[in-house]
């Protein structure tokens, strides 16, 4: 049966994004902007993160257990295991934006 979702505020009515959230059973979904020339601390979280790169370039990357990983904005999604030590680095002159959700 088709499930209809009603939103109290039209701001949250994004059929395409909502279909991705539902299809992958994501929670705590957010748009994350990593400012140019910044990085996060090297840390661990719990669980896996679903990433859809929206705006990025070759100077934006992750370091996961001392291995560099790049997620291009090619329309695909990527899974990051945040149980491992990791950081995100933006060494470019432009902000990086990802849609991120917890799995």
What are the language-model segments listed below?
Residues 53-73:
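A short beta-strand-loop-beta hairpin characteristic of the jelly-roll/cupin
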Residues 30-32, 53, 63, 89, ...:
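Residues in well-ordered beta-strands of folded domains
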Residues 33, 44-60:
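Short, conserved beta-strand element in jelly-roll/cupin
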Residues 37, 47-49, 83:
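Short beta-strand-initiation
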Residues 27, 46-48, 95:
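Residues that flank catalytic or metal-binding motifs in active/ligand-binding sites
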Residues 50-53, 77-79, 93-103:
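A short hydrophobic beta-strand segment most commonly corresponding to one strand
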Residues 1-34:
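Signature of the catalytic double-stranded beta-helix
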Residues 40-43, 60-62, 71, 80-92, ...:
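Short beta-strand His + acidic residue motifs that chelate non-heme Fe in jelly-roll/DSBH
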């Amino acid at each position: 049966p088709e499930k209809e979702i009603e939103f109290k505020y039209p701001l949250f009515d994004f059929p395409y994004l909502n279909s991705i959230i539902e299809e992958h059973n994501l929670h705590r979904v957010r748009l994350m902007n990593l400012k140019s020339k910044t990085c996060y601390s090297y840390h661990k979280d719990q669980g896996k993160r679903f990433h859809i790169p929206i705006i990025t370039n070759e100077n934006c990357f992750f370091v996961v257990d001392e291995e560099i990983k790049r997620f291009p904005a090619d329309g695909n999604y990527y899974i990051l295991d945040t149980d491992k030590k990791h950081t995100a680095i933006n060494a470019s002159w432009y902000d990086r934006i990802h849609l991120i959700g917890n799995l």
